[in-house]
Amino acid sequence: MDWVPWIFGLGDVRWLGWASEYPVSLVLWLLCFVGHLGIWCVVFNRVHATALPRKFRKQSEKVIVPIVVLPFCYMVVGMCLWFDTTFDSNYIVFKIYMFLAVVSSFYFVGRWVNRRFIVGLPAAVVSSERVWLDIRERVHEEVSGDFFEGAVPQLLGVVPFNEASKLTLQKVTLAFDIPEQLEGFKICQLSDLHLTGHICIEYFQEIVKEANQFEPDMVVITGDLIDEAICLSWLESTIGQLKAKYGVFYVLGNHDKRISDEAMLRGKIEACGLVAVSGAWHEVDVEGVKIVITGNELPWYRAVDQLPPPDQQPESDFAILLSHSPDQLEWARDYKLSLIHI
């Protein structure tokens, strides 16, 4: 079978008896779906990685989600009900897109295989362990109301195999060429807590307890802390209870922009004892060893523009960046930072 001409005629293949007669066709259709999903996941992620107005981003979701879902539903229903389901592929644009989707699938699958099985962990990673804790089971006796608040969260909470109440703990041991005073230095990173009010406050209090049991030397929070102003009153009894020998540091992320009064938000966070590091160098002395911490909140907040150029970076034995966006990796390389928390 000549693949390229076949792909350009892909939409003319009918489902009736198709899977058994055309196994290669089935594989190519699946590749087409993988590529289609990958393309629109990239679009979705890039839109949400920008500082575009939230209204525009929410409207874009109403376009992207149907584009992703409807072709799957159309073809799956056709298979299940043995409909004579055919895409009209007389349009050259449709044919070209299907061809690009198949080609893209090789790229996405290749990237996944390379990252998962070939490249492996970075050289600095000595070990990495991951465990999942079901917080709902831990706090069920302490929760005065419902664990999930609101009809939709409650409905989603009963869906089998959902992980809405689970906490992922990942313990990573890193090896650096560092002064002996930093041997065994423990950093606890919290990210994407998303205080929305949809999950009870006890859930987040239990996360803080778990973090404190780790007895970290330093705690860093890397964005998307709070979505709804109604949860501002939760800050003191949640993140305000974090304990670390050398301090608790934070940067904001895209979801924190939902709190329109930025100065008020930062004021309440810092009133809980957290230290803002975006656009500044914060120095920490660890038994005579100098650690500097900075933060980059681009593209959502501009404080990083206040930093001096890389050649004026303060001297240190170890430099740490906090960011909510992996797009700042090149920026971090310019500043020759030792460790990046995203």
Question: Could you say what each language-model-derived stretch is?
Answer:
Residues 1-167:
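Non-catalytic terminal accessory segments
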Residues 53-58, 89-98, 196-285:
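Core catalytic region of metal-dependent phosphoesterases/phosphodiesterases
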Residues 167, 176-188, 282-293:
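Beta-strand-turn-beta hairpins that frame and shape the catalytic cleft
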Residues 189, 221-222, 295:
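A structural signal for the hydrophobic beta-strands that form the central parallel beta-sheet
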Residues 194-199, 225-228, 296-301, 318-319:
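Short, flexible loop segments at the rims of nucleotide/cofactor-binding pockets, characterized by
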Residues 217, 246, 317-319, 338:
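Conserved acidic residues
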Residues 267, 271-273, 287-323, 329-330, ...:
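Binuclear metal-dependent hydrolase catalytic cores centered on His/Asp/Glu-rich metal-binding motifs
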Residues 340-342:
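Conserved small/polar residues in nucleotide/adenosyl-binding loops
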